[in-house]
Amino acid sequence: MIQPQTLLNVADNSGAQKLMCIRIIGTGNHRYAHLGDVIVAVIKEAVPNMPLERSEIIRAVIVRTCKELKRDNGMIIRYDDNAAVIIDQEGNPKGTRIFGAIARELRQLNFTKIVSLAPEVL
């Protein structure tokens, strides 16, 4: 469960390292964001000499959460960290590589480009 002021790791090579959630997009007045939700975030840490810099406002999709995700078949998935991938307005990732495993549910949410870049889909 991601709420405003939550710090997230960045799971791609766009240049940012840490994000802080500001707002949850498209969920009305929901308090928490879950796997596959799009958030508005600010970059808190970034790699020098990269296109993205600190204090930039960006959009990101959540790909890993510490909170458990229960599937219809009874399987429960939980990750070690909260992580997101930075996307543009069309929903395409800004980076060219994705680090770590991501959930299969992103394919059903039309983030197929992110799923194709990921090394492991759980």
Curated annotation (Swiss-Prot):
One of its GO terms (cellular component) is cytosolic large ribosomal subunit. Its main location: plastid. It comes from the Eukaryota. Pfam families: Ribosomal_L14. One of its GO terms (molecular function) is structural constituent of ribosome. Keywords: Chloroplast, Plastid, Ribonucleoprotein, Ribosomal protein, RNA-binding, rRNA-binding. It is found in: Plastid, Chloroplast. SUPFAM superfamilies: Ribosomal protein L14. Gene3D superfamilies: Ribosomal protein L14. GO terms for biological process: translation. InterPro entries: Ribosomal_uL14, Ribosomal_uL14_bac-type, Ribosomal_uL14_CS, Ribosomal_uL14_sf. SMART domains: Ribosomal_L14. Part of the 50S ribosomal subunit. Belongs to the universal ribosomal protein uL14 family. Binds to 23S rRNA. This is Large ribosomal subunit protein uL14c. It comes from Phalaenopsis aphrodite subsp. formosana. The lineage of its organism: Eukaryota, Viridiplantae, Streptophyta, Embryophyta, Tracheophyta.
